[in-house]
Amino acid sequence: MSRNLIYRRNRALCFVLILFCFPYRFGARNTPEAEQSTAKATQIIHVSNSTWHDFSRLVDVQIGSHVSGVSELKRYLHRFGYVNDGSEIFSDVFDGPLESAISLYQENLGLPITGRLDTSTVTLMSLPRCGVSDTHMTINNDFLHTTAHYTYFNGKPKWNRDTLTYAISKTHKLDYLTSEDVKTVFRRAFSQWSSVIPVSFEEVDDFTTADLKIGFYAGDHGDGLPFDGVLGTLAHAFAPENGRLHLDAAETWIVDDDLKGSSEVAVDLESVATHEIGHLLGLGHSSQESAVMYPSLRPRTKKVDLTVDDVAGVLKLYGPNPKLRLDSLTQSEDSIKNGTVSHRFLSGNFIGYVLLVVGLILFL
């Protein structure tokens, strides 16, 4: 038997084994399981997002309707890449292009694809989120496409060196957070990614020469992506090798784990930092709600542990860290307690993890 044939046979066998060990990961998007996985999104959020229009009045609005607020919805979808209109002047008519945009939004956010403004869709649109567009991304289209939810920036840009320096701005900062607190948060966030890929991150003082530049900015800060106030877009970062990571200074950022006792509009800095570092590395948004790279994040929510989807996406770009530990891969067991999302190890599926890692390496 030829070496090439053996290789292809082993790839196929590995894929079958992964299917066997992770059957629930391979369902189509529009299934009862998918609807169950997004059930949390149907809970109307209690915190009003004053930055964006009150979309709640648009629930169940039908195509052909003329309703005040639809123009704001179109502007929102335009902001995140779903509506292409150079004039940026939108009507209040629920038309065909809007229905198509809603369907694409639902697909990208892991919702049942209906094209309708159901409660789960409208609620998700009201949540604070990352400012990076959901579209203009490259979808993973390899043999494992049916299992993957991660995306990349167009062209799949990546860094071509194994050590990246980063610096936190000493001028664009927050008065109520100490420099050391912010640095500690980012050290933890960077370590999440460096633990799974052969890239290390070195903190430096020189902001101008650092590969990755981090700072807090308010409003229009000159990069073409102005921030919009409390609980709108939380942050954004640029594809490699741009290196800029900007956080909205208008947010109430917290760096401890006292989420329950914090303000109703508090945002966990480490959760957002971990997400944005994924963008710095070249990852786009994931349609899997449990993933760190999912675009939306509820206030007072902590989500910092990389899921299998996050890890699979970044491994396809950089390959595995030689020191990658199997038990560092987390499979989400989303349990929302007191406003926090907890990600726990699946202790009962160790063999599945072994096969998954082997499969990822074979497909790299």
Curated annotation (Swiss-Prot):
Keywords: Cell membrane, Glycoprotein, GPI-anchor, Hydrolase, Lipoprotein, Membrane, Metal-binding, Metalloprotease, Protease, Signal, Zinc, Zymogen. A motif (Cysteine switch) lies at residues 128-135. Ca(2+) 2 binds at D211, G243. InterPro entries: M10A_MMP (IPR033739), MetalloPept_cat_dom_sf (IPR024079), Pept_M10_metallopeptidase (IPR001818), Pept_M10A (IPR021190), Peptidase_Metallo (IPR006026), Peptidoglycan-bd-like (IPR002477), PGBD-like_sf (IPR036365). It is an enzyme of class 3 (hydrolase). Optimum temperature is 45-55 degrees Celsius. Residues 1-28 form the signal peptide. Zn(2+) 2 binds at C130, H275, H279, H285. Optimum pH is 7-8. Its EC number is 3.4.24.-. One of its GO terms (molecular function) is metalloendopeptidase activity. GO terms for biological process: proteolysis. A lipid is attached at G339 (GPI-anchor amidated glycine). It holds the Pfam family PG_binding_1. Ca(2+) 1 binds at D228, G229, D248, E251. Mostly expressed in flowers, roots and stems, and, to a lower extent, in leaves. The conserved cysteine present in the cysteine-switch motif binds the catalytic zinc ion, thus inhibiting the enzyme. The dissociation of the cysteine from the zinc ion upon the activation-peptide release activates the enzyme. Matrix metalloproteinases (MMPs) or matrixins may play a role in the degradation and remodeling of the extracellular matrix (ECM) during development or in response to stresses. Can cleave myelin basic protein as well as fluorigenic peptide substrates, McaPLANvaDpaAR-NH(2) and McaPChaGNvaHADpa-NH(2) 4-fold more efficiently than McaPLGLDpaAR-NH(2) (QF24). Active on myelin basic protein (MBP) and, to some extent, on McaPLGLDpaAR-NH(2) (QF24) and beta-casein. This is Metalloendoproteinase 1-MMP. The lineage of its organism: Eukaryota, Viridiplantae, Streptophyta, Embryophyta, Tracheophyta.
